[in-house]
A protein has these predicted regions:
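Catalytic beta-strand/loop cores that center a nucleophilic Ser/Cys/Thr
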Residues: 154-242, 283, 369-382
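Helical hinge/lid and interdomain linker segments adjacent to catalytic or ligand-binding clefts
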Residues: 39, 49-132, 277-366
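Extracellular ligand-binding/catalytic regions of CAZymes and related secreted enzymes
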Residues: 30-38, 62, 110, 133-138, ...
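Class I SAM-dependent methyltransferase SAM-binding "motif I" and its flanking Rossmann-like core
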Residues: 114, 130-173
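Bacterial N-terminal signal peptides that target proteins for export
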Residues: 1-9
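Bacterial N-terminal signal peptides
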Residues: 8-18
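Bacterial Sec-dependent signal peptides at the C-terminal "C-region" and cleavage site
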Residues: 18-33
Length: 382
């Protein structure tokens, strides 16, 4: 009987001891906390434009390591840079971007960097880095030395390879009017910087311009206070073939490697174009991400370049989110545009307007004006 009692006591106490031991072990080795996401602020106000803005938003938002925050100039003036880790200034117009922030408030960007923030700029975003704008790194630009949209050759030097964790060599990249820059011996900038590689080919309009273009820094990197700055004169965000360069830029300023996972699509999804011309702001980005995440919607970004290549022949629906009525009216006013959109709608294509395209595009039964708060997905999937 004593043996039975001892056995029962042991079996009752053993789980308690095990639980106690486990508690001690857990107390000494607590479960790892969830990894904090990199908070990336994307500037979407006036001066941020074009497909590049939406490509950047997709790369960031679809990366599990990052959280996308869209920023207007008023957000920066209100001190919201303190809530992010990296500021991204996209292509568009650098003067307009600075004006949207307010020239009296550009010091907030510099303070953000002094305190350890990161800065990533493409095209206009590189203009902002230069002596002529925010004075973040000791570089400036030649006047009227750039060119039109084209594929050009860019060097990835040994510094770039190490800083971005990519392979050195010569790469083909998309260029579209970015700054042709040069290093300054005497600069007003507090920052220190280096070239990550130079242009090896040119789209300049003259021999004189070409002499400035070839051999000029295509991208630059440096420090400003405790923060890090990287900027590209070209557009690595556009094409999958250069995404490693774009993602390397985020790594260079944050130490975090973004690995975007794009939404999978079902067989034969609805082919949708998003007109990105004049479409900055929070809502167009939110709309883009909402559409892109749906498995039955295959989304393309559309500007004049894509229209000229005949993209409307491959779309079922075109969504127009821009609120800039005067600019849209001018955009759709040419005989070529009128013909393109008439053929698109006559052949069954549908235009969904949640912006201000009404009156800019000729009336048609397939032109549908939607309420501002409409669920665009529902109309597309009808």
């Amino acid at each position: 009987m004593k043996k039975v009692f001892a056995w029962l006591l042991a079996t009752a106490v053993l789980p308690l001891l095990c639980c106690s031991c486990a508690s001690d072990v857990n107390a000494q080795n607590p479960a790892p906390a969830a990894e904090k996401k990199l908070r990336v602020g994307l500037f979407v106000d006036n001066g941020a434009s074009g497909n590049g803005l939406f490509h950047l938003a997709g790369l960031i938002a679809h990366s599990p390591q990052a959280e996308l925050v869209t920023l207007m100039g008023s957000d920066i003036r209100a001190g919201k840079l303190k809530d992010i880790d990296v500021l991204v200034m996209p292509g568009g117009g650098s003067r307009k971007q600075c004006n949207a922030i307010g020239n009296d408030h550009l010091e907030k960007v510099r303070d953000f960097l002094r305190n350890g923030g990161g800065y990533v700029g493409t095209c206009a975003g590189m203009f902002n880095v230069l002596e002529c704008r925010m004075k973040l790194l000791p570089f400036d630009r030649y006047l009227n030395a750039g060119g039109s949209t084209a594929w050009v050759s860019v060097e990835v030097n040994q510094d770039a390879a190490k800083i971005l964790d990519i392979k050195p060599g010569i790469r083909k990249v998309r260029y579209s009017g970015g700054p042709v820059s040069y290093a300054l011996a005497n600069s007003k900038s507090e920052g220190k910087g280096i070239s990550l590689g130079v242009y090896k080919s040119s789209v300049s309009r003259s021999k004189e311009q070409e002499g400035k273009f070839i051999g000029s820094p295509a991208w630059i990197y440096g420090s400003y206070g405790k923060g890090k700055v990287i900027a590209t004169s070209f557009h690595p965000e556009y094409e999958e073939s250069t995404h490693d360069m774009m993602l390397g830029c985020f790594y260079a300023v944050s130490g975090v490697k973004l690995t975007p996972v794009f939404p999978k699509k079902n067989y034969r999804p609805v082919r949708v174009g998003l007109l990105t011309s004049y479409a900055g702001g929070h809502k167009p980005i939110e709309l883009m991400l909402d559409l892109e995440r749906h498995p039955d919607i295959d989304l393309d970004y559309v500007m004049a370049t894509e229209l000229d290549k005949g993209i409307l022949k491959h779309l079922d629906v075109l969504v127009v989110p821009s609120p800039q009525k005067a600019m849209l009216k001018k955009f759709f006013a040419t005989d070529l545009r009128k013909k393109q959109f008439a053929e698109f709608m006559n052949n069954g294509g549908v235009i969904l307007d949640i912006g201000e395209a009404e009156g800019a595009i000729q009336p048609h039964k397939n032109f549908i004006k939607l309420p501002k708060n409409a669920d665009v997905k529902k109309y597309i999937l009808k």
